[in-house]
């Protein structure tokens, strides 16, 4: 709350491994307190204050005295892409998720990183095949058709446009045992494999 001391807020961040905290009053978002705002309000290491005086100051200063009041927020109905864009555009590492002026949660840069890893299939056991090809209609469909034809399961695909009007297509496949066999299958059908690697299961 706004009346929480910055000392308590700092302790809470440290205990929970957080860098920022939304400030709530009457169930509504009124600000944001960060490690940076607390550090700016804290006495310098070069201060002549005694440890007792510093502790007194930290326990007297309230969150409302240092919090950021102009907070960028996102609706709980927004897409992950919209949230990512807002964070990127506004150079912030956290977005309170607001519904009818009430905070229902927060999304952080760590959440974005985790979502990216999950979408890209990182940490899944199988085979990842990478193609660099012309960005034209039908390429991805052809890749998928050849994989399904072999009876394999596609865990996910990622398409990354390049600056030279080409596209990087990465496909995560389950059940492949013969790497050279699947490579030959693709290349026999005119699809050059840029890289093929086994992936191991990892907890995210």
Language model region names:
Residues 1-17, 24, 73-91, 98, ...:
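The conserved cystathionine-beta-synthase
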Residues 4, 33, 61, 78, ...:
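Short beta-to-alpha loop/turn elements within the nucleotide-binding domains of ABC transporters
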Residues 13, 21-37, 87, 95-110:
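A glycine-centered beta-loop-beta connector
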Residues 35-72, 84-88, 102, 108-144, ...:
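Tandem CBS (Bateman) regulatory domains
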Residues 132, 170-174:
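Short hydrophobic/aromatic beta-strand micro-patches
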Residues 161-168, 197-204:
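Short proline/glycine- and acidic-rich turn/helix-capping motifs at secondary-structure junctions
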Residues 192-196:
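Short secondary-structure junctions
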């Amino acid at each position: 709350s706004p009346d929480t001391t910055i000392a308590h807020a700092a302790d809470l961040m440290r205990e929970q491994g957080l860098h920022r905290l939304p400030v709530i009053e009457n169930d509504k978002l009124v600000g944001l307190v960060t490690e940076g705002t607390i550090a700016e309000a804290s006495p310098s290491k070069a201060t002549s204050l005694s440890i007792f005086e510093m502790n007194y100051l930290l326990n007297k200063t309230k969150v409302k005295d240092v919090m950021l009041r102009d907070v960028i927020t996102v609706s709980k109905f927004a897409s992950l892409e919209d949230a990512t864009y807002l964070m990127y555009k506004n150079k912030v590492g956290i977005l309170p998720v607001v519904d009818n002026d009430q905070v229902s949660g927060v999304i952080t840069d760590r959440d974005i990183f985790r979502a990216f890893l999950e979408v890209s299939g990182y940490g899944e056991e199988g085979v990842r095949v990478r193609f660099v090809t012309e960005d034209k209609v039908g390429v991805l469909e052809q890749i998928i058709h050849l994989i399904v034809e072999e009876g394999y399961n596609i865990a996910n695909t990622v398409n990354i446009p390049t600056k030279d009007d080409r596209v990087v297509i990465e496909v995560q496949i389950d059940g492949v045992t013969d790497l050279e066999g699947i490579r030959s299958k693709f290349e026999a059908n005119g699809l050059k494999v840029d890289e093929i690697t086994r992936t191991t299961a990892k907890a995210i």
